[in-house]
UniProtKB/Swiss-Prot annotation:
This is Photosystem II reaction center protein Z. InterPro entries: PSII_PsbZ, PSII_PsbZ_sf. Keywords: Chloroplast, Membrane, Photosynthesis, Photosystem II, Plastid, Reaction center, Thylakoid, Transmembrane, Transmembrane helix. It holds the Pfam family Ycf9. It is found in: Plastid, Chloroplast thylakoid membrane.
Length: 62
């Protein structure tokens, strides 16, 4: 169970880092938002899901 928690935390950190870089780039590009809107929403949905997964796994471990 600890391995699953550590992998979920790593995935959350990796997703956060990717979104931290990609979202400003999408907003700064001229046609970026209209063409990459689905990718940003998918990444945000993944991030929210990982936050809940980490919270659930944390409650099971401690």
């Amino acid at each position: 169970m600890t391995i699953a928690f550590q992998l979920a935390v790593f995935a959350l950190i990796a997703t956060s880092s990717i979104l931290l870089i990609s979202v400003p780039v999408v907003f700064a590009s001229s046609d970026g938002w209209s063409s990459n809107k689905n990718v940003v929403f998918s990444g945000t949905s993944l991030w929210i899901g990982l936050v809940f997964l980490v919270a659930i796994l944390n409650s099971l471990i401690s």
